[in-house]
Amino acid sequence: LSSAASDVYKRQTVERLLHRWGHIVAVGTTSVRTLESLAALAWRIRREGSPDEMRAVGQWELYDIPASYTGREALEELLAYMERNDLGTLKASTQIMIAPLGYRWRIVRAIVTNFHQPKSTLLLLVSAYVGEDWHRIYDYALRNDFRFLSYGDSSLLVNDAPFAG
C-alpha cells in the first residue's frame, strides 16, 4: 500500500483473528502486509500510548519490534486499546516491506498468492516466507507453464518454521 492508501481495522476483525489464532490464512500479498502491520500498530500503543493512525507504518518498522513481542500479544494489545477507547475501528496505512532479512512472522500462518515477477518486492515477501524453497517453487511453476501475475495461477504457501505468534 502507498502512504495514501488506508486500511480500516474493525474491532470485530481483531476479535476474530484472536479467536482463530494460529490458523490465519492471508489471501494476497496486500492482505499479508495489512495483517502483519497490526503488530506495528500494537507496538506503537505499547511504546507511545497510541497507534498514531496518522503516521503510516514505515517500510522497515516491523523489524524494530523486539523478537519476544508475539502476534497474539499484539492483537490483544490492539483489542484492549480499542475497547478502552470505545473504538469500533482504527484506520491506518502501511508502507512495510517484508524481505528475507530475518523477518519474524507474527500474524499470518499461510498465504494464498499469485506467482510474482522476478526481482519484485512481492517475490521478496514470498522468499521471506518460504526461504530458499522459493527457487524450487518458481522453477516448478516455470517448467509447468503456470501463469504469472494478477490473473495467473496461485499457490498456497504454508511455512512450518518457528512462528513468533
Regions of interest found by a model, annotated:
Residues 6-165:
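Surface-exposed, charge/polar-rich loops and edge strands
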Residues 1-5:
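Extracellular interaction modules
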